A protein has these predicted regions:
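Hydrophobic helix-coil surface modules that form long, contiguous segments used
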Residues: 8-12, 19-179
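Short active-site segment of divalent metal-dependent hydrolases/proteases
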Residues: 183
């Protein structure tokens, strides 16, 4: 729409975006450049390498990804708000479009749960988080609970920003979703 866009290439839709062998066992390194309106922001699997402004447009070049299956390649662009939190040398950025301050205030719980999931996974496996970054994008009306794109995890807004009196099931569901997408 005129406000934002995102990719969702699971299970074998990458071939609709670019020519590829669209099967999970074959991985590739992706480089991406996006030409977007100047007031938009963009998020992808890898960190931003450079931004260039020209005549109301923004050209964003991203660093090359680590090897990924094609269905895990992702980018998001649009008018997003963002919050960042750093702990133990890791910074996570949350992108969202929610305007209700009570819902946005849940960012503390969301960050707590993401950092806890990452720490548990690293402790359990003995392997540090293998990707350059972990950003999360809370997408209005996202058709699944979430999608584990490395470096740019997408989440459904209703599953992340709960109502004023969430049930235990809703709270546990959010934690389970975060743990699932983190692994």
């Amino acid at each position: 729409n005129d406000e934002f866009l995102y990719t969702l290439l699971v299970p074998e839709r990458a071939r609709t975006l670019f020519p590829c062998f669209d099967q999970p066992d074959m991985k590739a390194v992706f480089t991406l450049q996006l030409d977007i309106p100047e007031q938009w922001v963009a998020v992808a699997n890898a960190a931003v390498e450079s931004e260039t402004l020209h005549e109301g447009r923004k050209l964003i070049a991203f660093q090359p990804t680590q090897p990924l299956s094609t269905y895990l390649f992702s980018f998001v662009a649009g008018k997003w708000q963002q919050l960042a939190e750093s702990r133990d040398g890791k910074t996570i950025v949350m992108y969202y479009r929610e305007t209700d301050p009570q819902k946005v205030a849940q960012h503390t719980i969301i960050f707590d749960q993401v950092f806890a999931s990452l720490k548990w996974l690293e402790d359990y496996t003995g392997i540090p988080y293998p990707f350059d970054k972990y950003d999360l994008v809370i997408v209005p009306g996202f058709q699944f609970g979430g999608m584990e794109h490395p470096g740019a995890v997408l989440y459904n807004d209703k599953r992340m920003f709960l109502g004023p009196h969430p049930t235990i099931e809703e709270e546990l569901g959010r934690m389970e979703l975060i743990a699932h997408e983190t692994t």
